[in-house]
Amino acid sequence: MATNPIEEIIGSTDIYLLDQIMKGRYKMNDTILDAGCGYGRNLHWFLRNNFVLYGIDQDVHAIHDLQRRHPLIANRFFPSAVEKMLFEDAQFNHIISSAVLHFAKDTAHFRQMIAEMVRVLKPSGSLFIRMTSDIGIEDKVRLVGEGVYEIPDGSRRFLLTRRLLEDLKRENELTFLEPLKTVNVDDVRCMSTVVVTR
């Protein structure tokens, strides 16, 4: 059976992260952290191109799977919560957080995760965030907890709002590297992509 040559190169990397790759955001010798890496969906291209890559996730099974599949760099993957990372200040050139932050328990938890990622990000480094938001479906979501909403697809998620994003930029001295992008999936869910620097 023939394999898909594109999949061999990019794996199942998020399309908006591919956009950043294609724009040359990530340079050889950059140190990259995937904060909430899971089983490594977004790591394929970076691993294939020998980037200095680290990954954390609370799912111990996912981390063990990554360590097994990548034994030469197994010590760069370990279980950790995003809000309690053991890295040094300003350790990474880039941080990726894709489909992670909408699992925040509340706004305080979300702010802790953002602050911790900013802490370990080098000055002028990039922070890539992809998460659910209310942008475009503000009148279709129902608040069920502090920052947590029930969205039209029936799930409950912490949602990024325009106001919260502006607050976070101000509090953490972040600026946009790219315009905010939001995809509306048939008015049942919206996913926003934020790329910022400190």
Question: Language model features by range: what are they?
Answer:
Residues 1-83, 126-198:
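Class I (Rossmann-like) S-adenosyl-L-methionine-dependent methyltransferase catalytic domain
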Residues 101, 113, 133:
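Flexible, active-site-proximal loop/turn residues at the rims of small-molecule/cofactor binding pockets
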Residues 99-103, 108:
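Short catalytic micro-motifs in class I SAM-dependent methyltransferases
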Residues 60, 107-111:
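Non-membrane alpha-helical structural segments and their capping/turn regions in soluble enzymes
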Residues 84-89:
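Short conserved loop adjoining the S-adenosyl-L-methionine
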Residues 111-123:
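A short glycine-rich, Lys/Arg-flanked "PGG" loop and its adjoining helix->strand segment in the class I
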Residues 96:
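A conserved beta-strand element that flanks and buttresses the S-adenosyl-L-methionine
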